[in-house]
Amino acid sequence: MTFDPTSDRLYIQDVTLRDGMHAILHMYGTDSVRTIAKALDEAGVDAIEVSHGDGLNGSTFNYGFGAHTDWDWIEAAADVIKNAVLTTLLVPGIGTAEELKRAYSMGVRSVRVATHCTEADVGKQHIGIARDLGMDVSGFLMMSHMIEPEALAQQALLMESYGAHCVYVTDSGGALDMDGVIARLQAYDRVLKPETQRGIHAHHNLSLGVANSIVAAQAGAVRIDASLAGMGAGAGNAPLEVFIAAANRKGWKHGCDVMALMDAADDIIRPLQDRPVRVDRETLSLGYAGVYSSFLRHAEKAAEQYGIDTREILVELGNRRMVGGQEDMIIDVALDLIKAKAN
């Protein structure tokens, strides 16, 4: 895709109010949602994603119950957003067509349909319904590090064929490096239409969230996911204010006020964190083992319950190639580790 961030405008997609849910166990209050959404809107981001961390209808026993419903959160954000595109995320099998239609009725105009990187076909119906509603639609290929670039590109091609306007390289495990990101976007270029946008969703588990987003833009990614103070699963997403500062230094075009983003990150977001969103031994283990970032809090809970090291659980999850949706297996892994030690 021919895209030059020095002459073409980046599309900055904030994920503080969706991926950021994972960082505080989906406990955002509606007042906080209003405050954050207003700050983001005034700072000039292009789109603001709002839902449970696991997407529409994600508030369940398996993923964790939210402090409010998706509808409460979406309504709170819609009350204050004046310019940004209200966006949500849907994982087929968790969210349904009915939730998608309800979100649209509440003002959501963009959706990311998220599947595991080998399962683009399960998003066909939801992408089609979103297009029929007139929504902007992105295909979101989660855990993109788990398959080779050419295989990922074939999945991206499916999402394009279903009607996605944009297809993401989604580094859910924060396990990709810059070469891996570039290789995947170059593979996209070999099969996707020039008019289909590319996107990058980075996690910071190896401290490469910003670097991966920078090289993604240089490789043709128009849409850049990021969050205030990196608020997100694991070590968080690419920190929005940091990415924008780096983009400014490169002379790239976007609509964001970096100072306003810095203020929102430090004054609004960091005080909400009950566990610091940072690279530490546990979150580093996510990227090292290539594990789904939202497993972090579940694994820490299991480790505390059974008296074992969180890192052991995370590494074993990586060895077993567990993916999003298998949160219920974390307890099984912990018990297997205890049994192995006893023997």
Swiss-Prot record:
The active site is at 22 (proton acceptor). Pfam families: DmpG_comm, HMGL-like. It is an enzyme of class 4 (lyase). GO terms for molecular function: 2-isopropylmalate synthase activity; 4-hydroxy-2-oxovalerate aldolase activity; manganese ion binding. InterPro entries: 2-IPM_HCS-like, 4OH_2_O-val_aldolase, Aldolase_TIM, DmpG_comm, DRE_TIM_HOA, PYR_CT. Substrate binds at residues 18-19, 172, 201, 292. Residues 10-262 form the Pyruvate carboxyltransferase domain. It catalyses: (S)-4-hydroxy-2-oxopentanoate = acetaldehyde + pyruvate. Keywords: Aromatic hydrocarbons catabolism, Lyase, Manganese, Metal-binding, Plasmid. Its EC number is 4.1.3.39. The record marks 18 as: Transition state stabilizer. HAMAP family: HOA. This is 4-hydroxy-2-oxovalerate aldolase 2. The lineage of its organism: Bacteria, Pseudomonadati, Pseudomonadota, Alphaproteobacteria, Sphingomonadales.
